[in-house]
């Protein structure tokens, strides 16, 4: 796997009000917001002064994410930025490690993503993020 860095921490929340409360407490601002059809969720990427790693709030509208942590939400995943999500998928699958998707899917705000199944990541859901252009999150 080529260059990696922590891109963001994903937090599932049951509603927008909870995300706004969190942002108010910690002085986060919305950097980019977009609905991700593949996961039926409104995704809000944040920024904060001197913050190198983004926080992504995931507000599901339907599907399995609505039941995450019994519907209360919580820290969901850690995301690693890579140069080529598809190359990462192939590399790990050659080692017998499976991803959630057969191919990368569109994420919010100019990225494509895929997730390594938690059983291969020491119980942690790891997302791989590829930025599609310079102004992607």
Where are the language model's segments positioned?
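Short loop segments at secondary-structure junctions
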Residues: 16, 49-51, 61-62, 83, ...
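Long, hydrophobic N-terminal alpha-helical segment
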Residues: 1-39
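Vicinal oxygen chelate
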Residues: 1-2, 6-14, 35, 44-49, 55, 66-91, ...
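Short N-terminal helix-initiation segments at or just after the protein's N-terminus
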Residues: 15-28, 59-65, 89, 124-128
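Beta-hairpin (beta-strand-turn-beta-strand) motif
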Residues: 60, 78-85, 104, 131
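A cross-kingdom feature marking solvent-exposed beta-strand/loop segments within repeated
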Residues: 6, 38, 61-70, 74-76, ...
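Short, structured motif recognition centered on aromatic/hydrophobic residues
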Residues: 6-13, 23, 46, 53-58, ...
